[in-house]
Amino acid sequence: MADKTKILIIGGTGYIGKFIVEASAKSEHPTFALARESTISDPVKGKIIQGFKNSGVTILTGDLYDHESLVKAIKQVDVVISTVGQLQLADQVKIIAAIKEAGNVKRFFPSDFGTDVDRCHAVEPAKSSFEIKSQIRRAIEAEGIPYTFVSANYFAGYSLPTLVQPEVTAPPRDKVIILGDGNAKAVFNEENDIGTYTIKAVDDARTLNKILYIKPPKNIYSFNELVALWEKKIGKTLEKIYVPEEQVLKQIQESPFPINIVMAINHSAFVKGDLTNFKIEPSFGVEASELYPDVKYTTVEEYLDQFV
């Protein structure tokens, strides 16, 4: 185990961060998570930290905004994975600066994990958020830091339990709202699989300075196909309400935060088809299920079974 790549996760108690920490610990990489004192003592996040410790994760006390603590943590590892949330995306320049100073990092994974921000046509407010991710990518490239950008598309846990329906907590049983014409294809990945694929990429020369797209063939569905699959599972035909693009754009403008950002992401994926309207070229990207055929990923069909 001594020669296994040491991995530091920054933002490990966040939504996708937890899955990446778990995948790293499970794969027997020496795993480190950076946490603030306030996170460790927090009643909710403290439990997550304790869970990490129980899995053999080393907790390093530090802060994104404390340069010395960042450098000190980074010097102990080989690979840095950032899973910081929306509000800290721009502050990843601090991680970049610390990586440059530490000088020992073999790979940096910034907090990406969604749509490929360099190949999308999102409207505000998602546009600004994607632009920040894009700026971080350019900063990493400019500094010559070895990287992998993970494009994980939709998190299944965010989208499939409601079949991408707004402001509900269960999948539809009567009627379903479909954005656009319902034909643009999107991609849905179970969070544990995102963690597994990300950690597999850590030591892989094929993913160095590339975008790792998580697009397993059985998880690519248009809205219409997703609805048809659900109808088959529940043995019932749903009433379909199609929302034309102009109306989707109007709803985005009129909705409060954070509903508007979710709607803008859905518009990008389901109206513009931004998750699938380009070909992955070897010059910039690789696809996870092709690289790692041994990973038995959860399919959309299997995932939906729990809600029937």
Curated annotation (Swiss-Prot):
- Signal peptide range equals none
- Tell me a GO cellular component: cytoplasm
* Keyword Oxidoreductase found: yes
The protein's predominant localisation is: cytoplasm
Which compartment or compartments is the protein found in?
A: Cytoplasm
Q: Which GO terms describe its molecular function?
A: oxidoreductase activity
Q: Which domain of life is it from?
A: Eukaryota
Record bears the keyword Ribonucleoprotein: no
What InterPro entries does this protein's entry cite?
NAD(P)-bd_dom_sf (IPR036291), NmrA-like (IPR008030), NmrA-type/Isoflavone_red_sf (IPR050608), PCBER-like (IPR045312)
* Active site, renumbered: 133
Q: Which UniProt keywords apply?
A: Allergen, Cytoplasm, NADP, Oxidoreductase
A Pfam family of this chain: NmrA
Annotated residues that bind NADP(+) are located at 11-17, 36, 45, 137
The similarity comment for this entry is:
Belongs to the NmrA-type oxidoreductase family. Isoflavone reductase subfamily.
Question: Misc remark for this entry?
Answer: The catalytic tetrad is probably composed of Lys-133, Tyr-158, Ser-159 and Asn-153.
Subunit: Homodimer.
- This chain belongs to the protein called Isoflavone reductase-like protein
Tell me which species this is from. Answer: Olea europaea (Common olive)
